[in-house]
Amino acid sequence: MIGVRQMEKFDVTGMTCAACSAHVERAVRGVEGVKEVTVSLLTNSMTVDFSSPATAEKICAAVSAAGYGASPQNQGGKKENKKTLLESNEPKKILHRLIASVVLLLPLMYVSMGHLMWGWPMPQIFASDPLAIGLYQLLLTTAVMVINQRFFISGTKSLFHGAPNMDTLVSLGSAAAYIYSTAVLFEMCNAAVNGNVQMAMHHLHGLYLESAAMILTLITVGKYLEAVSKGRTTDAIKSLMDLAPKTACVIRDGKEQVIPAEEVVKGDTFVVRPGESIPVDGRVISGESAVDESALTGESIPVDKAPGSLVSAATLNQNGFLTCEATRVGEDTTLSQIIDMVENASATKAPIAKIADKVSSVFVPTVMAIALAAGAAWLISGRPFSFALARAISVLVISCPCALGLATPVAIMVGSGMGAKHGVLFKTATALEQTGKTQIVVLDKTGTLTQGKPQVTDIVPADGFNNDSLLKLAASLESKSEHPLAAAITRKAGESNIIADEAQGFSALPGHGVSAEINGKSAIGGNASLLKSKGILDSAMEAAGERLAGEGKTPLYFAIDGKLAGIIAVADVVKYDSKQAISELRSMGVRTVMLTGDNRRTALTVAKQIGVENVVSDVLPGDKADVVKKLQKYGTVAMVGDGINDAPALTQADTGIAIGAGADVALDAADVVLMKSSVRDVAASIRLSRQVLRNIHENLFWAFFYNCIGIPIAAGALIPVFNIALNPMFGAAAMSLSSFCVVTNALRLNFFKPDRPCKGKSKPPVKLPGLMPAEENIKNTEETAMKKTVYIEGMMCNHCTAHVQKALEALDGVESVEVSLEDKKAVLTLKNDVDNAVIMNAVKDAGYEPTKCE
C-alpha cells in the first residue's frame, strides 16, 4: 500500500562542493519511497518528496551513511529562527582559521623563501644549519595542517565513502607535499649525521612544506571569500524577514495590550497608529489611512484604506489610526508566504543545472586520475620524482568542483530575491529559467490590460440638461441595479458629490435597461433600442452613441418624463501603463496576443489603443487554454491573467503569470506571481529571468573554462613549448579565487533595474501564421465596411439633416448614416450593398435633391 506523499525539508551538514551535494542526492534517491530530491549546496538544505515506506528517519540515516549529517527543518519555526539559519557563523569560523594560518605561514615563508627570492637576511640560528631550517618548516606546517584539519577529515571520510570531493583533492595535494617533504627531511638528517652538509643543503631545496601550508591557507582564503559572498546572496530574504514587526497592539478585555506579533491569533482586534507597521494580515474595521505597501509590492504610491479594506503584515501605516481584525497570522501572512516562495525557488534546481550536476558526479575521480597520470608521465619522461609530484599536486589543487556547483544556485538565489524586492515572485527555479525563454505573451484583456471594472468615460447631456443633472438622473435610476455598468455610474456620482434621488417602482428590463419613477416622473435608462421603442431617441444623439460605441465604449441613454436627457458612456478603461508595457515587450522581441471574450469591435478598439500585435476575440473562458495550446506550436508561451478565471490557460502555458495577486500570492495555477497590477511587471519578469540566465551561462562558462584550461596547465602542458611550470601554490591561489569569482558575478544581479533593457540583441519575434495582426484586423474592418456618399442640395438646418438621416437609415442594408450640413452630403455605412438609385430615391422622397452618389 502506497502511503501519503509528503514534502519535507532537511538541513544538511558536511557538504563542501558540488560532488558532496551530488553524493547526498544519490544516497537519498536510493531510499525506497523517495520520489524526488533536490539538494542545495548554497543553503546546505535538501527538499525531499517521499511516501511510505520512506520516512524522515530513513532519509537522515541514508545521508549519515553517505558521510554527512541531516536533520528535518522545523517547518513551524519563527522567522527569527529562519533568519538565524541564514545568518551562518561559518564566515566567522573560517576567518579565525585563516588568521591563525596566516600568522604561522608568514614566518614559514620568510625562512623558506625570503632569503632565496628577495635576499632577506636569515636568522642567525638557521644561518648554517639546513636541518634546523627543515625542522622549523615541519613544525609550522604541521601546525597549519592541524588548524585546517577539517579538509583532511572531510576529504578522507568522503574518499572512504566512495564519493571524493573538493576536500579530498585539497587534502591529497597538501598531504602528498607534506609526506614527500617529511621523507626528504629524513634524508637530510641522514646526511647531517654523516657530516655531509652540502648534501643536506641540496635536500633542503627539495622540501615542499611551505607549499603544503600555503595550499591550505590559500584555499581557506577562497573559502572565506566564498562564505561571505554566499551570505550576501540571502540579503533579499533577510531584508524581508527584517520587515516583520516584533510586536502588536491588540485589544483584549476592552484594553490595549502590546504582545509579540507571533502571539496574535486569527480574529484578534489590533490597532495601528500612524508611523507603525501592520503586524499581521487583516481587515480594517474602522479608521481611514494611506498605507505604504512598497515593501511587499514594490509600488511606491501609498494605497488608501477604509473600513473593509485588506491590510498586510509589514506594510507601513502612514497617517491614520486603524482598527483591524486579524485574518491571517504567523506563517499564513502574505509576508511569510513571500519569504517561503523565495526560499523554495532557491532550494529547487533549474533544468540548466543538470549539466553541472552530471559533470560534478564524475569530476573529482577524473581529476584524481589526471593527477596520477600526469605524475606518472613526467616520471616516465625522466624527470625527478619531486618534479612529477609537483605536477600531480598542481592538478589536484587547481581543480575546482565548487565553481561548477555554485554557478546556477547563486544566480537563482540572488535573482529570486531581487524579483521579490520588485514584486515579482518566481515559485521555482524552473519558472525563473523558463520565463526568460518566452516568445509569445498572451494577455487576458479584462483586469490585465484594463482596470477590470467599468468606469464612466463620457457624459453627453441633451438640450435642457447639464452634466450634473444627467448624472444625478442616471445615478437615481441605477441606484437599485446590481449591474456593473450601474455601479460605475453610482460610483461616478459619489465622486462628484452628487446625491441621488429616491427611485420608486424600480424595474429591470432584461436586455434593454431599467425604469423607475423619480420625483413622480417616469424615467428610463438603457440601450438605444429601449429609447427608440418609446420614440424618444433623436438621430443626433443616436449618432453620438454610435460614435462612442465605435470607440469600444457602452453608451447608455437616459430619459425622464418622455424627454431625452442624454448619454453616459461606460467602458473598462485601459490601464495607464498597458501601452508602455506592450511597447517594452515588442522591443524585447516578444509577440503579444490579447485574449478576450469581448466582441471583435471592442477588442480591436482596445488593441489599437495599446498597440497589441494580435487579437483573439469572442473567446469563452473554457476555450482560453485551447488558444494557448495552439499558440505553443509557434513558440514558448507565457499566459498572463488574474490566476482564478484564467487558471486552465495559466496551467496550459509554458509559464503562467498571475497579475495583481496582492495578498493571494499562493495561486496554484501560476508559476510567476506579480504582486502589483502593472502590466510592465510582465516585461520586468522576462527581463530579470533573461539576466539570470545570462549570469548562469557566464558562471558555467567560467567554471568549465577555468577547469579545462587550468588542469592541463597544472599538469605541465606548457612545459615542452614554453618551459612554464605551474607552482602548486599558484594552483591553490587560482582555485581559491574561482568560486569567489562565480559568486561575485552572481551578486551583480543585485543591480538589476526592472526598466533597464537587457544587454545584447533580442531574437527576432516568432511568426504567428494562424493569427492576423491587430493592425491588419483594424485595417480590414475599416476597408470591408462598405461606405457610400450621397451629395444633397436643399438642406437648410439640423432638422433637415435629421430628416435625411432618418430616411436613409430606414433602408435595408444601411448600418449607420452621418449627415453633414456644411459639406451637403451624407455618408452611409452599409451592411450589404445598396443600389445608388435606391439611396437617391430615398433622399428625393424625403423632399431634398440628390446630385450624386458614389
What are these regions (language model features)?
Residues M117-L131, F160, I179, M418, ...:
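Membrane-embedded alpha-helical bundles of multi-pass transporters
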Residues E32-S51, A56, A61, G206-L209, ...:
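Conserved cytosolic catalytic loops of P-type ATPases
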Residues A22, T438, I518-G520, A544, ...:
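Conserved ATP-binding TGD loop and adjacent catalytic N/P-domain core of P-type ATPases
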Residues T142-F151, S158-H161, A175, S211-L240, ...:
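Hydrophobic alpha-helical transmembrane segments
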Residues K82, M188, V197-A200, A213-P274, ...:
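Juxtamembrane coupling segments of multi-pass membrane pumps/enzymes
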Residues V456, V460-M588, R600, V612-V628:
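P-type ATPase nucleotide-binding
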Residues M1-A132, K255-E256, D340-T348, K753-E854:
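Flexible metal-binding regulatory segments at protein termini and peripheral loops
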Residues K92-T247, K358, I459, N723-P728, ...:
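Transmembrane helix-loop-helix hairpins at the membrane interface
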